Amino acid sequence: MNQIDQKNEDFTEDLFHGIKVLDFSWVGVGPITTKYFADLGGEVIRIESVTRPDVLRGAPPFKDGVPGINRSQFGANWNTSKKGLGMNLALQESRDLVLKLIDEWKPDIIAESFTPRVMKSWKLDYKSISRLHPEIIYFSTCQMGQTGPQSSYAGFGQLAGSLAGFYSLTGWPDRDPAGPYGAYSDFLNPPIAFGAIIAALMYRNKTGMGQHIDLSQFEGATHFLAPHIMKYNDDGTVFSRIANEEYESIPHDIYPAKDEVRKMVGLGESWIAISVQTDSQWESLAVILGLEAALRLKTIEGRKVYKSIIDSAITEWCSNRGAQEIMIFLQNAGIPAGAVQSQSDLWNDPQL
């Protein structure tokens, strides 16, 4: 490692050295956000109750397949680099201890992810804390935010993803909404939160004043569908499910590939994703498929008309080749393609 690389690595590891975070959050968005600070040199103390532990502690997979409050992979992944403090905040003496901790330890950031009622009932909300510590940056993130007619509704990433519109767009047009994998909004919101908190730190450096950051996970997730929302506002277009297709790319789908060895060892079928995004990519693919006659379909509008024929030709061509082979071949030809990989594929992926 050269001196520049070493300097950059040290800078990254110590980026938030001296920044203190008192973390009351649980499950996804809050813990992921505070982990950014912990991993980059900040000191994070996580407050958690044994009587009502983070529900993520009960989520599989567990170490050695044995369930336990300290054995969840998810719980560990999103809370490494932090210190833990067990405390039952339903008790006044615990809340008094928290206030003493804030007075003496002087955290820069307080993070919480409860519905508005909870921290208010404990008198640990922003209004209560900022009276004594106006420099505090107080980060709140629950599903619906601190205000509005549904602010008391609790929920997880799957619910926020559904409310934000992702489920209406994911799946096949003739089937029920499928939704994206997992608690989708849990992974969309932390970068937004991280940027907002950094901006608040910069503001405090200039003014000496903290502020309250209210990140509704529902609202944050909708930003990733901004083009669809703006299109509706513009001309009333309502987008819906189009399976594996893409409005601006044809062909764009997942095709079955050949891989007998994969089936023999119980890894299931082999699939390849292909996405032609430009007319020049289509020309290259048409030659590979032996569809020289289709070269005249140089625009996406032309290819839409013959989509079923094009898909059939791709399916036939892929049926005699493995997914990895197809991916490498098409990538070398300048055509976006990727093998559909399972966990076992990822484990053995030379790039990873």
Please identify what each model-predicted range represents:
Residues 1-206:
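N-terminal helix-loop segment corresponding to the beta1-alpha1 unit
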Residues 75, 239-247, 253-254, 274:
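Short Gly/Pro-enriched turn/cap motifs at secondary-structure boundaries
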Residues 190-210, 223-234, 286-293:
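Oxidoreductase and adenylate-handling cofactor-binding alpha/beta cores
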Residues 251-333, 337, 344:
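Aromatic-enriched alpha-helical interface/lid elements that frame and gate functional surfaces
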Residues 339-352:
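Conserved PLP-binding catalytic core of the aspartate aminotransferase-like
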